[in-house]
């Protein structure tokens, strides 16, 4: 999730089966950024408490969080503002956030320290590698993908994170009844998401008309989104539920 239209923290899409050597197409761009004092504080003091390292083994998140609770996985939380808002509003839910942009990671960690929140853990690496290796199958209640990079140019469409392989990976990680919730402000990408997910087996579109849902109350409105609304820009939300 991000307050900018292009969140840099999406994963890499495998072009081949996982059992074979993989070439990957990155759906994110690593961007350098200057750290503020608060962001550096977050990394220095918050990472030892809330940070997680990529592992080749499935992680016991019940042990990591110290409880059993509904679990939400967020790809690309940007500067972490919406993540903090969701975590504060739902203390009974555990959040796993992934972001490669270090200032954003620092900002979220600093916010966790400042607000005294304990229901968030953070990775700073390729989100799809975390899903593949660290997250058990059928263990997530929700997966959030808010405002991923739309890769506007046609020659870059292969970089979009939402592809058939992504849909299948997410389906494996969601519980039956779990939901993939996506949002974008770029209508052609919204249509692309809809096409990919409508063709993906094992899902049900929760939209009554089979297209898009109204903005769910649980998704915070970002500053970028408010600016867009004032300019008449649209935002499209999609919710697909795993049914088998």
UniProtKB/Swiss-Prot annotation:
InterPro entries for the chain: SAM-dependent_MTases_sf (IPR029063), tRNA_(Gua-N-7)_MeTrfase_Trmb (IPR003358), tRNA_methyltr_TrmB_bact (IPR055361)
GO molecular function, one term: tRNA (guanine(46)-N7)-methyltransferase activity
Keyword presence, Heme: no
Record keywords, A-Z: Methyltransferase, S-adenosyl-L-methionine, Transferase, tRNA processing
SUPFAM superfamilies, A to Z: S-adenosyl-L-methionine-dependent methyltransferases
Record: residues binding S-adenosyl-L-methionine: 74, 99, 126, 149
Record-annotated active site: 149
Chain ranges passing through the membrane: none
Ranges for region Disordered: 1-20
Residues reported to bind substrate: 153, 185, 222-225
Keyword Disulfide bond among record annotations: no
Comp. bias (Polar residues): 1-10
Gene Ontology annotations for the cellular component aspect, listed alphabetically: tRNA methyltransferase complex
Principal EC category: transferase
Listed EC numbers: 2.1.1.33
Pfam family for this entry, one: Methyltransf_4
Pathway of action: tRNA modification; N(7)-methylguanine-tRNA biosynthesis
CDD domains assigned to the protein according to its UniProt record, in alphabetical order: AdoMet_MTases (cd02440)
Reactions the enzyme catalyzes: guanosine(46) in tRNA + S-adenosyl-L-methionine = N(7)-methylguanosine(46) in tRNA + S-adenosyl-L-homocysteine
Family: Belongs to the class I-like SAM-binding methyltransferase superfamily. TrmB family.
Summary of the function given for this chain in its UniProt record: Catalyzes the formation of N(7)-methylguanine at position 46 (m7G46) in tRNA.
Entries under NCBIfam families matching the protein: tRNA (guanosine(46)-N7)-methyltransferase TrmB
Annotated HAMAP family: tRNA_methyltr_TrmB (MF_01057)
Protein name: tRNA (guanine-N(7)-)-methyltransferase
Organism of derivation: Pseudomonas aeruginosa (strain UCBPP-PA14)
Gene name tied to this protein: trmB
């Amino acid at each position: 999730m991000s307050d900018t239209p292009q969140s840099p923290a999406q994963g890499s899409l495998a072009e081949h089966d996982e059992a074979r050597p993989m070439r990957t197409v990155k759906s994110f761009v690593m961007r350098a950024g200057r750290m503020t004092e608060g962001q550096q504080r977050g990394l220095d003091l918050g990472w030892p408490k809330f940070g997680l390292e990529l592992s080749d083994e499935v992680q016991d998140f019940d042990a990591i969080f110290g409880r059993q609770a509904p679990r939400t996985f967020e790809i690309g939380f940007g500067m972490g503002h919406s993540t903090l808002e969701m975590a504060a509003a739902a203390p009974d839910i555990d959040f796993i956030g992934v972001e490669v942009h270090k200032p954003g990671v620092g900002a979220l960690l600093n916010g966790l320290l400042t607000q005294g929140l304990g229901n968030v853990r953070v990775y700073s690496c390729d989100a799809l590698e975390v899903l593949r290796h660290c997250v058990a199958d059928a263990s997530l209640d929700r997966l959030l993908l808010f405002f991923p990079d739309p890769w506007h140019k046609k020659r870059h469409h292969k970089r979009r994170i939402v592809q058939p392989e992504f849909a299948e990976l997410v389906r494996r990680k969601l519980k039956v009844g779990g939901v993939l919730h996506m949002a974008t402000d770029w209508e052609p990408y919204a249509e692309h998401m809809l096409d990919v997910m409508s063709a993906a087996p094992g899902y049900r579109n929760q939209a009554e008309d089979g297209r898009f849902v109204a903005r769910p109350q649980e998704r915070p409105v970002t500053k970028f989104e408010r600016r867009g609304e004032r300019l008449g820009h649209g935002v499209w939300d999609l919710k697909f539920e795993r049914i088998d």
